[in-house]
């Protein structure tokens, strides 16, 4: 196993022409952009510092119109219309990594004290060209116009505005039950193969598509919140829950002749996570959703989405014991061993085990883990929760049966971003769980079998390179011998349009890097316009096919590409004018059973 180092920034280039030859990197334009201070010093200052104190200087959200704040001397002011346009772009494209308050997490902090030192030209170049460490090349990819890039560089120099709270009153006002439980079917009324159905996020359309995993037919397109982040299944497999980044939750009854939303609610202004109770005897009883803003989670009735319990996550950072005003709720999973929800609180570095047996006397186990917790998943036994503290480059392991911290391990890479991770049996190490990274090209394996392979348990056993930095998801299946790794956010079109495939049976564990095969997914899709990015492999129920989204601009052609897992050859391309910005895909059976 080789030690991996993060992507180093190349030296300054003399001209924009040379920058275009060598690739669309933000640093390529630094000298031409003439930042107001030495770039190396500027970058050092731009890093998130562990001793930052958090001031409650709050920000606004995409849907709300606000008056532009006054600009300090020397910084151009924005009109109200310009400020609202920039605000909308920020919360649609940037807040997920940089935070509602711009305090940073997966991405660097973008508070005015930092951005004003960097200066307009530096910000303009970085937004335009991106970096291999996971910052998209918004300008050169065409996703933002030159005018929008300039607008965003100016916007980041200004103080943020304050967003409103969102409590029980607002939730209940948004809550709607379209079909009461007693009026719903008592058995499945359609002939769909629900277990092999895919829920596909149509990000910028504010919709999901339900697609038959056998025939590839788009069975239905349903309106949802904006930019659905995830789809989750009830334990019974009947109800599909989706949550948009705008905090809207839709509960869809798949038993209806034409599946439709039977209940909905808005749980905040910015959100990412939803889950349902899975413990035996508690199946489908509750749903839980977590918000980025306000920082809180809400437990809801599992049949109606009626909000029952709201808990704020504001509080003290676990290690510094300093107050944080924006500890966002990231991944939420349901325990298979206890009637508990597992809740990641990003900025404070705490994992909450929330006992849902008695909401009036709520019991919560608070585990000190590591800051900047993001996503993660269960090991193959479903007992251990493995999650990434991505800005700290760590993996945290929780024993969900015993309810305690097991291990914290450095991955050796930069900014792990596993999605739910990938479980497989390594020929040498035994059962492992894998993560890829946003900030470099590495894949890390951690041992997950404390009984059968105790010497390997909870240790980083191997690290090896894939296609490049900017990976968002890694995927395999119990019936597959292959491990698929995307590089969605890489600024190089050839890399972001491909995936790396590793043969897990050929891995040796002798310190040599396993070879991978590159699948040109975007090329197979036959899309000639834009910079289509390939994102998130998702298997069908049987593990014989893996689907990839070919994600393009809202007004450009996108597609879904289906790969034969045995031959690694193209099997099918799904194209339809309704497939607008497809991103996440969730197979009903695999999602319901936590198979990954």
Swiss-Prot record:
| EC code(s) of this entry | 1.7.2.1, 1.7.99.1
Q: Quick one: signal sequence residues?
A: 1-29
- Residues the record lists as binding heme d1: 54, 57, 138, 203, 229, 232, 245, 272, 292, 420, 536, 583
Q: Which GO terms describe its cellular component?
A: periplasmic space
Looking up CDD domains in the UniProt record yields: 8prop_hemeD1_NirS
**Where are the residues of the annotated region D1-heme domain?**
163-596
Q: Name the chain's protein.
A: Nitrite reductase
Gene that encodes it: nirS
